[in-house]
């Protein structure tokens, strides 16, 4: 358990550092984007609380002979919808598609948790439902939301949307693999290894997502200012 605590502590430090960087980045992005940028700060900010609790030994229950970290699922229930909400806002998606996207992502986590605390074979059925719901998330991100992005954004902004979308989708696809191989599934991956992998994924997906968006938003802001200068000169 000492090893697991170490991984949680490292995860906490990673989320703290990432939140600090993103909080500073708030002052660097264009004012018109700051409202949605707050979502990027909130994502690792919420994870700080979750990892602090897990590092201190709180937030887990025993189910079917293995530990289930309830706090981790609460973290995901709150943060992963924020990731897809940011993508929908960036793309200028409709309210209907945005709500569908956020709800489907939240339900994916709910069914993943339900599967983790339920004996097999029901656990696998619940896991499959969660997987199907996540398939709906992927469909919306690559279809409806992508169409909205292409119709409303500049080429550079569309590229940012695609980068962030592919980033989270690819990394999020690793989580169900860990679930299946870990204690909740077939048990081929020990708890320490599964914890290490999940901590790494959490820090990369939360902080990495935010940093990629931050750097792109700074560049877009600088490009906008540069484009305005010739106009101002011409007006003079």
Swiss-Prot record:
CDD domains: 7tm_SRI_SRII (cd15029). The keyword Cell inner membrane does not apply. InterPro entries: Arc/bac/fun_rhodopsins, Rhodopsin_retinal_BS. Its main location: membrane. One of its GO terms (cellular component) is plasma membrane. Gene3D superfamilies: Rhodopsin 7-helix transmembrane proteins. It comes from the Archaea. It is a multi-pass membrane protein. GO terms for molecular function: monoatomic ion channel activity; photoreceptor activity. This is Sensory rhodopsin-2. The gene is sop2.
């Amino acid at each position: 358990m000492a090893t697991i605590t170490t991984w949680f502590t490292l995860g906490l430090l990673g989320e703290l550092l990432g939140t600090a960087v993103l909080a500073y980045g708030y002052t660097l992005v264009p004012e018109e984007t700051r409202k949605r940028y707050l979502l990027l700060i909130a994502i690792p900010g919420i994870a700080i609380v979750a990892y602090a609790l897990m590092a201190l030994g709180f937030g887990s229950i025993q189910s079917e002979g293995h530990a289930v970290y309830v706090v981790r699922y609460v973290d995901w229930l709150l943060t992963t919808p924020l990731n897809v909400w940011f993508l929908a806002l960036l793309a200028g998606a409709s309210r209907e598609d945005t709500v569908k996207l956020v709800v489907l992502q939240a339900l994916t986590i709910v069914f993943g948790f339900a599967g983790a605390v339920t004996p097999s074979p029901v656990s696998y059925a619940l896991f499959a439902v969660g997987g199907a719901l996540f398939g709906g998330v992927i469909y919306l991100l690559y279809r409806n939301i992508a169409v909205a992005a292409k119709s409303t954004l500049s080429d550079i902004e569309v590229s940012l949307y695609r980068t962030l979308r592919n980033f989270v989708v690819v990394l999020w696809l690793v989580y169900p693999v860990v679930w299946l191989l870990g204690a909740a599934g077939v048990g081929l991956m020990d708890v320490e290894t599964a914890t290490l992998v999940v901590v790494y994924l959490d820090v990369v997906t939360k902080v990495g997502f935010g940093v990629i968006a931050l750097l792109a938003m700074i560049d877009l802001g600088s490009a906008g200012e540069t484009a305005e200068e010739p106009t101002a000169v011409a007006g003079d």
